[in-house]
Amino acid sequence: MKNLIILLFLLLTFESCTKMEMAEPTNEEVFYVCEIMGIVPPDYGGIGAIVSFNGVTTQTDQRGIYRFNEVKVSSKHNLIRIVKEGYYEDVRVFMTDRPAIIKIRSGLNKKSCGGGFNAFNGSDRQGNKYSYTFLPNSIVLESGISYTSFVDLCSEYIDPRDNKSIVGNFVGYDLNNKPFKLRPLGVISLEMMGVGGQNIRMAEGKTISLSVEIPDDMLSESPTSIILWYFDFNSGYWREGGIAIRDGSKYKANVSKVGYWGFHLAREAVIISGNTVLADGNPVYHPSDINYVQGLSPFFNYETTNFDGSFKEWAPKDENLGIRFNYGGTTHKADVTKCGQECKLGDIKLSIVFNKTITGAVVDCNNNPVKSGYIKRRSNFSDEVYVPVVNGRFNDNVYWNIIGTVASYYPIDIDNNQESKPT
């Protein structure tokens, strides 16, 4: 295997404080040329998955990583679709307010099939975390003709606290087409087909009875009734689909079709955007998790900044929020006053001690810049981290808070499927 060459150029230390600025938003749709690097962890089916964006298709590598280089990204709505044999399809939506190195974090759910039944008799399955009931003679062919043969059913309970397993970006639209920020309390996926792969559906006026167990640590915030949402794979958003009623530690509802169904807390939403920076204004290159906090507890906590520190996400509307950025083992908070419309927060400075920024270049054995690749960084005191290489260059933040910390950098060239020895 040919070796890649990695050149380390710069090592800096920064300290910072938190400050937030507001700016007037714009409603005009703008397209930016961006880099996209997505990660589908191998334990979430990430190896060899097919990823599509705007008519371009690629595949995840042995670490579940994929890249789209110099692609046009909308300031309003973008959709990435991920498929793999034996897994449920995954869809992620995102947006940007600048040319960015965008990070997409997702996962695939393995199909659990074998719950088949005869449509003439129906089915009643009672599990520990979810249950479903199909009434007899409630299924038809796509043409509307009654279907009474075998139904091949795949069903799955999805942990509402596992953000990589839940499709979309936790945004839904109600019946009036208003956007809402969602927090799942339970998610069920159902998929069915007839003999020989026949397309079948629920008959008009027939429903499936669903119930889902509410996690113990979410019971205190679970209301007596909640909006039921189904996932729209065409738009990448959840859609209002009914009401679920709480019965003890469960939510129960009737639905008219199979698919992804979510029992979600919801707040009317507005777009916020900004940029995380260090004290001197340089970007925070390593993505940090974003928590939206109301009162003393996190309510929405499923976002992440991009590889260049930028973010553009949905947040609860007209509510005082604390935005917590988890980075380097510590939490950095920025308070946000009520946003009744799209808010641009400007630069948010993070208080990061012991931080060092490393920049460098990656070239192949012919001394040509690696156009599409990434750096695998390992250290003796942190998990494995992946950093994008863009036009032969990379930027990384390392949180050196322990004496004796050692980091190794492994450059990977995606286009030529090459990996070098560590530097």
Language model: regions and residue ranges:
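C-terminal motif of bacterial Sec signal peptides marking the signal peptidase cleavage site
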Residues: 13-16
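Proteolytic cleavage junctions
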Residues: 20-27, 63, 103-125, 178-183, ...
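Structural motif
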Residues: 25-50, 273-287, 359-372
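Hydrophobic beta-strand segments
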Residues: 48-53, 94, 153, 228, ...
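Short, acidic Ser/Thr/Gly-rich low-complexity loop/linker segments typical of extracellular
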Residues: 50-67, 294-316, 380-397
